[in-house]
Amino acid sequence: MRDRSTRRLQRLLGGIAVAWAVGSVSAGAQQSPSGPLTLSDAIEAALKNYPAIKERRARAQAAEEDVNVARTAYLPRLDFLFQENRATTNNVFGLLLPQSIVPPISGPVLGSRSYDSVWGSAAGVLLSWEAVDFGQRKAAVDIARAQSTAARAQTVLTELDVASAAADAFLTVLAADESVRAARANVERLQVFADSVRTLVSNQLRPGADQSRAEAELAMAKNQLSQAIQITETARATLADAIGAAGAPVELTVGPLATVPDVNVEALNAKNHPAAQFNQASIDAVRARQQALDRAYFPTVTFQSAYSGRGTGAEVPGQPSLGSGAWLQVPNWAIGATVAFPAFDLFSINARKRVEAQNVLGESARYDQTIQTLTTQDVRARALTKAAVDIAKNTPVELQAARDAESRARARYQNGLTTVTEVAEAQRLLAQAEADDALARLGVWRALLATAQAHGDLAPFLAKVRQP
């Protein structure tokens, strides 16, 4: 019997240890929160300070700016150029394939191979505007918008995860504090009992084995108290990390969490969950890329207008000299239109379409998996809520019975009607009942939090928390 109760308490402490052990990586200590924190304060601090949220918001804003970047493709392009050079004037007939190494030379063939050089200059301005693209730029803007929507959805999902983690860490600290209180009360009772047994043994009214057993029980209770305190301190560190104030001391106020709330769980609409909306936005982004590929195999029409001037120090036989060439001497202007069509891009475009088709299937499968996971989480949360409510209704009965049993066991021992073993077992049972009663109320709140997280909206949960 004693071993079974001890194992129950150890499992309780172990469960709390597992709860606070799962946390996110923090980016460094933040400013210590001022005053005791309520659960709402903890969530607000997490949404304000947690680095992961700041990162997501910045990336979402960057994705929004990408839409503006895509829109700039509608604007005309204006390029300026000025060039000054000194070079030889030797020229030949013949073709030169397009490349970027050998500089071209304009003018007649002079038949010279001299290394004499002259000055040359050039300047110009070119105005280009892609007037017709058959929807290619609009498709690029649609891609940017879809990616921006996905980034915003991911930000909302991150906010939900961070807020839920902060709330869970808050409840974990409260549960750990209740375990400490129960363990400390058990130590105090066992201390009083051990002193009483010591007096009885000194008066030779009880055997010395009773004193040894009482002191052993007291030592075990003190060890359990030390373990509970360790778990509490570590849980507080996890909470500080969850609210973006890693390393800062945090003090909590229980507020309405000390009572059992009314439970009314709404039906799940998985499509409205931020995780589902993010997956849907990812599907839309892939489909936007598909639509862009549908517009890729079309020509583009570009209007161009240029004005330029050149100067050269080279002399052509029979022609008047134009000067030293250090400055512009011969002007030119041009206006026209260019139609460009990438004929052989058909093969790469078709290959990319096949890639995006598979990406749509993959993103759709992930969306279906998310809906299935959310549905399962909702079923589990409902089962957890029902069990938590039933336990919260039963623990007061357990606590009162344990108190009566402990009081009667002590009275029987004082009158010599039972052994120290029965008293020790009754006191452990009372310690467990006290912890169960305190944790049962928090268990209902934790179940409501799990339900709200499964539904993707913490507002109903926070409304209950803020109720007077």
Language model features with spans:
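Small/polar-residue-enriched beta-strand and adjacent coil segments characteristic
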Residues: P36-T38, R77-L157, Q277-R289, A296-T370, ...
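Bacterial Sec-pathway N-terminal export signals of envelope proteins
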Residues: A29-E84, T89-V92, E130-A131, G247, ...
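Acidic, low-complexity, intrinsically disordered peripheral segments
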Residues: R2, Q30-S32, R86-T88, A381, ...
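Periplasmic alpha-helical coiled-coil/stalk elements that build and connect Gram-negative outer-membrane
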Residues: R2, T158-N272, L384, A388, ...
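Short, glycine-/polar-rich solvent-exposed loops and beta-turns at beta-strand/coil boundaries
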Residues: T72-L75, V162, P207, Y297
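Bacterial N-terminal signal peptides that target proteins for export
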Residues: R2-G15, W20
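C-terminal segment of classical bacterial N-terminal signal peptides
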Residues: W20-G28
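Amphipathic alpha-helical coiled-coil segments
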Residues: E55-A70, T158, V162-R181, V192, ...
